[in-house]
From Swiss-Prot:
Keywords: Antimicrobial, Disulfide bond, Fungicide, Plant defense, Secreted, Signal. Pfam families: AtDEF-like. It is found in: Secreted. Disulfide bonds join 35-76, 41-64, 47-74, 51-75. This is Putative defensin-like protein 274. GO terms for cellular component: extracellular region. Belongs to the DEFL family. GO terms for biological process: defense response to fungus; killing of cells of another organism. It comes from the Eukaryota. Residues 1-23 form the signal peptide.
């Protein structure tokens, strides 16, 4: 009986760690004028995965901006 309780507690701890790691790894949106900055890119095609999320209310068009001090970043604009 004690062994099954230990297994249950260990399982709950593992699930809470997975949930907290997943929640922290979500990409954050930064607004810069009309752009929603998401992810890095080398060309406009790289922005498709960053600008077309299933959680977005509407599809966005993505363009790669090379002039940012942090490096090239995707500018996502609502269509």
């Amino acid at each position: 009986m004690a062994s099954s309780r230990f297994q249950l507690v260990a399982l709950l701890v593992v699930f809470s760690l997975v949930i907290s790691i997943t929640a922290n790894s979500v990409e954050k949106d930064v607004m810069d004028g009309p752009c929603r900055l998401r992810g890095t890119c080398n060309n406009d095609g790289d922005c498709d995965k960053h600008c077309h999320r299933s959680t977005d209310a509407a599809a966005m068009d993505g363009h790669c901006l090379f002039d940012k001090p942090t490096g090239p970043v995707c500018c996502c604009l609502f269509d």
